Structure formats: structure tokens, C-alpha cells
């Protein structure tokens, strides 16, 4: 049995099926379900599946720095909270700026200044207050610039962690995406341990290719053992494609995050 709450993205698995059927498949596998843009979805139909939804995109447009963009992010976050209510979804995910359908920033922001960081922290304080009023948690996700999201501000986990720690609210947590972090930063075990006090969930996929654990260079069983050894029992979500059969991908994911011996326990490797 995994010590973590396991989840998976319905956006990236069983993609030959309608979304409601993907959700049912993940739920039948005992997983929390995650989705992205809720505005294109039949929310009552998704709710009717009876699945446990864990995370969804928490804004439609906007950004963290420019005052007008920040106001738009807050306005669309309020709409997203209403959607989360329909699904009973506890976590709403945001990024450093609004992304288009290709994952590219609507307004590229290549250089982040100290003033930008301060402005972003103020916006995130407002977002945390909104989450508190509605009894929900917003998560801020790190991305990567090299492969998937060039031009996105606050892409590094180092930056997103600093922002979440500065706001220091139970209603704003870090969505630590280890696929993105491996591309941009590496040193995943130390990153996880440093971030754990502020983590709302951890997302995973292997590098390169963004498929399930075991298809790339990351030794996820070692990461899982470190997390378990540190006492983490929260959400770990597969946000990646299946290299082949999706059911097999889910089994590989589950196996990687069911560590036999936590790091630091008797019999663990040094």
C-alpha cells in the first residue's frame, strides 16, 4: 500500500476515450482525479461520475505581476472556486502567468526582477485570502522554460517555493512538479525535503518524454523513499503521458510510489 494519496491527470491518460470515461477509469483504479481548464467541460457530468477530484486549474486568465493581470487572475479565480464547488475539488492550481493552449505564456515575461517578486507575493496574498474565504487551497506550480513553457515567469521551484513561503498561508501551497524541476533544476530529493513544509501536492512524470516513472532518467523509487522517510503522506499525482498502455503506466506509477523501505529506516541503502 502506498503511503501517499495517489492521483492522476485525466487530461493525459486514456486520451482515446471521452473525458467522463477517463475520469471513471482513474476513479476505478483508486486514484484522485485532476483536470485542467474547467471552462471547456461539462461539470455536472463530471460530478455525476462520483469520482474524487483533487485538483483543477484555478484561474482562466491573468498573471501575478501586472496590476490589471492580477485583478483578472483574482476575478477568474473566483469563478474557478464556483466550479470547484460543483466537483468538490479541494485544490486549485495556478501558474506564474496565463498560458495559451500550447502551454506558452500569453504575455512572455523573460526576466523576473525583485519588484516582480514583490508584486507576485502581494497577488498571491490576495489569492490565499480568497481561498480562505471559500475553504479551498490554491497551489502555485513550478514549470520549465527549456522544453514546455519558454518565457514563463517564476518557473523554477526555487522561485515558487520562495513565494509560497513568503505568503505563509495554509490556503496557498506549492504544487511541486518534479518533471519540470528535473529539467530546470535537478537535485530532486534535496528539493523535496526543503519544500515539504510548504507542499500542497507533488506532481511527477519522467524525463525526457513526460511519461510514467521508469521510462526516463529519474529514479522515482528513491524519491518516494525519501518522501516517506520524511513523513510525507500527501498527494503524489501522475501528470504525464502513458508510454504505451495507460493501465500499465498507472501500475508503474503505483509501484514507484509504494516504497519498500523508507530512507533512513533499518535496511535502507546509505
Q: Would you name each region that the model predicts?
A:
Residues 34-50, 57-58, 64, 99, ...:
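Glycine-rich, proline-tolerant flexible connector loops at the mouths of alpha/beta enzymes
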Residues 67-173, 183, 266-269:
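Active-site acidic/histidine proton-transfer and metal-coordination neighborhood
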Residues 1-29, 39, 88-90, 99-104, ...:
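Histidine-acidic metal/acid-base catalytic patches
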Residues 6, 33, 53, 138, ...:
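Hydrophobic anchor at the start of a short beta-strand
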Residues 32, 52, 90, 137, ...:
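Residue-level detector of anion-binding/catalytic polar loops
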Residues 34-37, 54-57, 93, 139, ...:
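Conserved beta-strand positions in the central sheet of alpha/beta enzyme cores
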Residues 63-68, 212:
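Short, charged, surface-exposed secondary-structure boundary motifs
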Amino acid at each position: 500500500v502506498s503511503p501517499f494519496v495517489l492521483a492522476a491527470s485525466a487530461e493525459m491518460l486514456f486520451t482515446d476515450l471521452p473525458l467522463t470515461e477517463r475520469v471513471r477509469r482513474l476513479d476505478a483504479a483508486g486514484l484522485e482525479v485532476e483536470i485542467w481548464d474547467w471552462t471547456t467541460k461539462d461539470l455536472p457530468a463530471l460530478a455525476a461520475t462520483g469520482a474524487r477530484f483533487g485538483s483543477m486549474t484555478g484561474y482562466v486568465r491573468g498573471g501575478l505581476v501586472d496590476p490589471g493581470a492580477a485583478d483578472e487572475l483574482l476575478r477568474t479565480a473566483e469563478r474557478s472556486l464556483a466550479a470547484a464547488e460543483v466537483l468538490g475539488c479541494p485544490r486549485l492550481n495556478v501558474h506564474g502567468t496565463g498560458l495559451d493552449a500550447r502551454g506558452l505564456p500569453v504575455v512572455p515575461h523573460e526576466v523576473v526582477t525583485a519588484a516582480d517578486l514583490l508584486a507576485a507575493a502581494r497577488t498571491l496574498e490576495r489569492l490565499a485570502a480568497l481561498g480562505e474565504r471559500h475553504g479551498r487551497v490554491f497551489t502555485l506550480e513550478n514549470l520549465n522554460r527549456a522544453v514546455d513553457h519558454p518565457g514563463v515567469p517564476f518557473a523554477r521551484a526555487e522561485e515558487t517555493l520562495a513565494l509560497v513561503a513568503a505568503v505563509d498561508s495554509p490556503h496557498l501551497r506549492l504544487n511541486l512538479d518534479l518533471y519540470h524541476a528535473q529539467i530546470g533544476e535537478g537535485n530532486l530529493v534535496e528539493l523535496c525535503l526543503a519544500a515539504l513544509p510548504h507542499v500542497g501536492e507533488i506532481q511527477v512524470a519522467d524525463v525526457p518524454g513526460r511519461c510514467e516513472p521508469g521510462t526516463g532518467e529519474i529514479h522515482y523509487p528513491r524519491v518516494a523513499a525519501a518522501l516517506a522517510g520524511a513523513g510525507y503522506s500527501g498527494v503524489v499525482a501522475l501528470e504525464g503521458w502513458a508510454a504505451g498502455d495507460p493501465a500499465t503506466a498507472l501500475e508503474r506509477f503505483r509501484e514507484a510510489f509504494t516504497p519498500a523501505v523508507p530512507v533512513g529506516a533499518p535496511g535502507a541503502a546509505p
